Design a protein with these regions (language model features):
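Short amphipathic alpha-helix in the helical subdomain of ABC transporter nucleotide-binding domains
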Residues: 8, 132, 154-159, 181, ...
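Amphipathic alpha-helical packing segments from all-alpha helical-bundle domains
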Residues: 70, 99-110, 117-146, 155-160
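Hydrophobic alpha-helical connector segments
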Residues: 60, 73-103, 158-159
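C-terminal peripheral helix-coil segments that are non-catalytic and often amphipathic
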Residues: 2, 87, 91, 98, ...
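Helix-loop segment at the mouth of the active site in Rossmann-fold oxidoreductases
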Residues: 31, 152-153
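Short, basic, alpha-helical segments at the C-terminal edge of helix-turn-helix-like DNA-binding modules
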Residues: 62-70
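Solvent-exposed, amphipathic alpha-helical segments
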Residues: 18-25, 71-76, 161, 165-169
């Protein structure tokens, strides 16, 4: 436990991490201000110095994780021509699919105040699924220009299909612990890229 008056670096991230661990371990019923600060090793009042309450913490946690994935996606167009298209898409798909644990995602959707905060932030321009989708589309356009995708590939639709399906998986299937996010991402990318690369995930990639 950190003593009063002693600065703790990256307090918000510590609180986010603590909340994620509690949600994964105990579910929403275990998420209290005291439980979070205890898990994070912070003073009891630390949470309310950074957030108005649990709803704001959950909303900011989700927005922070989305922003992190969006920053990763922003780098994709600059990596066109590197590795393989499949590998690059699997990396970003896996990052998005693992950005939130299922309980956190479910709580964000089912808590009206948190859901409203997230929606308002995204509408105001906070990076989220739309930004990730646009970065993927830009990346696919760059790969098409290099001949690593079929010329007729609808890159916008392909990006939408990838992000939309991962969003669905993120929100609906992670309660099943038998599911492997890496396998899910690989199967999805293989299916989506098949028609654009002659039916083989590596075919035609130079």
């Amino acid at each position: 436990m950190s003593p009063r008056g002693v600065a703790i670096p990256d307090v918000r991230e510590r609180l986010f991490g603590a909340a994620e661990r509690i949600l994964a371990r105990e579910g929403p019923s275990g998420l209290t201000s005291r439980a979070i600060t205890t898990e994070a090793g912070c003073a009891k009042g630390m949470l309310h110095k950074h957030f108005a309450g649990l709803d704001e913490l959950v909303a900011e946690l989700v927005l922070t994780r989305f922003a992190s994935t969006a920053r990763l996606a922003e780098d994709l167009p600059g990596r066109a021509g590197e590795s393989t298209v499949a590998a690059n898409l699997k990396t970003i798909g896996y990052a998005l699919l693992t950005s939130l644990n299922p309980t956190t995602a479910g709580l964000a959707v089912s808590t009206p105040a948190a859901s409203l905060r997230i929606r308002e932030a995204l509408e105001a321009g906070a990076p989220g699924f739309d930004a990730i989708q646009q970065s993927i589309a830009d990346y696919l356009d760059a790969e098409a220009e290099r001949g690593r995708l079929a010329p007729a590939t609808d890159t916008t639709a392909l990006a939408l299909a990838l992000v939309g399906t991962v969003h669905h998986l993120l929100m609906t299937t992670w309660g099943d612990t038998a599911r492997d996010p890496g396998e899910q991402t690989e199967r999805l990318v293989t299916m989506l890229l098949g028609p654009t690369t002659g039916g083989s995930i590596g075919h035609g990639e130079r």
